[in-house]
Amino acid sequence: MKQNRKFFRRLLAVAFWLTVWQAAAMAIGQEVFLVSPVQALRTLVQLLPRADFWQRVGFSSGRILLGFVLGAVVSVVLAVCAARWSAADALLAPVMQLVKATPVASFIILALVWVRGSALSVLISFLMVLPVLYGAVRTGIASADVQLLEMAAVFRLPPGRRLRAVWLPAVLPAFRQGCSVALGICWKSGVAAEVIGLPNGSIGDALYRAKITLSTGELFAWTFVIILLSAGFEKLFLLALDKAVGAVLGEEGTKC
C-alpha cells in the first residue's frame, strides 16, 4: 500500500509538470521556442524506427560507458594506493581537486587538442568519473571498522577473507552511492563533449544539428532519450552491482 501511494505521488508530480510545460508551450505559441510535450513525444516516436537513431544511441552509449568503466577501475586502484601509501595520497590529492574544480567545457576544449572527436566522450567521461569514485572509495576505506581489522590481524586472516569480511562491507556502500552520482555525471559530460567535438553518428551531433536547424521538437526528443539512457543504465548497473555484492557477501551485501 505504501509503495503504491509513493508511486501515485510521483505520477501526480510528473503530471503536474507536464501540465505546466503544456501550458507554457500554449502561452508562447511558437514551437521554435518551446514545443509541447505532445509534439516532443510525437517527434521521438518518429525517430524510433530510423536506423541512424539506434546507431547514434549505440555509438554514444558505448563510448560514455567505456569512460565510466575505465574511470571506476582506475579510481579504485588509485584510492587503494592512496590509502596504503601516504606519498601516493599527497601526490593524488591536488590532481583530484584540480579535476573536480576545472569546468567540463575547459576539459573538452583542451582534450580536442589531444584526441579525436570520436574518442572525446570516452576521455571526458573518464575524467568526470575519476574524482567522484576516488573520493567514494577513500571514504569507504576510512570507514572500515578498526576493531575488525585488529581481530583480522590477531587471527591472521588471509588477504582474501580479510577483503571479504572487512574491506568490501566498508567500501561497497560508498562505492555504490558514488556510482549512482558518477553515472549521471558521465552521461551529461559525455554528451556535452559530443556537442562540442561533433563526432559523426553521435547523440551530441544530433543535438547540434537539431539546434542549428531550429528543430526544437527533435532537440527535446533527444534530450528525453539522454535522460532515459542515463536513468536506465544507472538502474541496470546498480541492480547488477547489488546482485554481484549479494553473491560475494551473502544476503547482507544486497542491502548496501
Predicted regions and their residues:
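Transmembrane-helix boundary motif in ABC transporter permease subunits
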Residues: 66-96, 109
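Non-cytoplasmic
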Residues: 178-228
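N-terminal signal-anchor transmembrane alpha helix
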Residues: 4-28
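C-terminal transmembrane helix and the adjacent membrane-cytosol boundary/short C-terminal tail
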Residues: 86, 177, 221-256
